[in-house]
A protein has these predicted regions:
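Short, well-ordered alpha-helical packing segments
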Residues: 43, 47, 51, 55-58, ...
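Domain-exit/linker segments immediately C-terminal to small folded modules
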Residues: 87-170
Length: 170
């Protein structure tokens, strides 16, 4: 909601300043300035949001988010209509990314033979938005129920998630 008065504007400005300072400290820890390569800054930000864990395996990632064994992964695959936006990106190992391939997390869980709830449990402690969690769980809702629409078209094809008013990252 937009600020309604000077006090709310001041509070919002202070929150923005604190977030900016926190982000800058995080980048400084990894020797990146604010003009650093966007993909490197994005990896650091995602590592922080994920609390240093892989959302697909639940295992600890290397302490350095710039480790060459890690890469950015599209949660909802690009080949299926996924966008390169923060809400659709996760940091994981190259090997996990290759194994997941062009699958949604739900399809990847089926490939691994693990319950999807187990994959979702990996994300519970992560600092993810509701939108990112929705994208991660895309495909789980097979038919309309209450206020939740099916993730599938009438012909059974998986719909593309609504990425909303999100700015592309790449």
């Amino acid at each position: 909601d937009p600020p309604r008065n000077a006090l709310q504007r001041a509070e919002r400005d202070q929150e923005m300043k604190e977030r900016r300072e926190k982000r800058n400290k995080l980048f400084e820890q990894h020797h990146l300035d604010d003009s650093g390569v966007a993909s490197r800054r994005r990896r650091v930000t995602l590592w922080e949001q994920q609390k240093g864990k892989c959302p697909f395996t639940g295992k600890e990632l290397p302490a350095n988010p710039l480790d060459p064994s890690l890469e950015l992964e599209h949660i909802f695959p690009e080949d299926m209509g996924g966008l390169s936006v923060e809400e659709n990106l996760a940091l994981t190992w190259r090997t996990v990314n290759a194994d997941k391939g062009k699958r949604t997390p739900l399809q990847f869980a089926a490939k691994l033979g693990v319950p999807f709830d187990q994959l979702m449990a990996h994300t519970q402690e992560m600092r993810w938005s509701a939108k990112k969690r929705e994208i991660f769980a895309w495909g789980a809702i097979k038919e309309d129920r209450g206020d939740q629409a099916s993730h599938y078209n009438p012909d059974g094809a998986l719909r593309i998630p609504d990425f909303g008013n999100i700015t592309r990252m790449a």
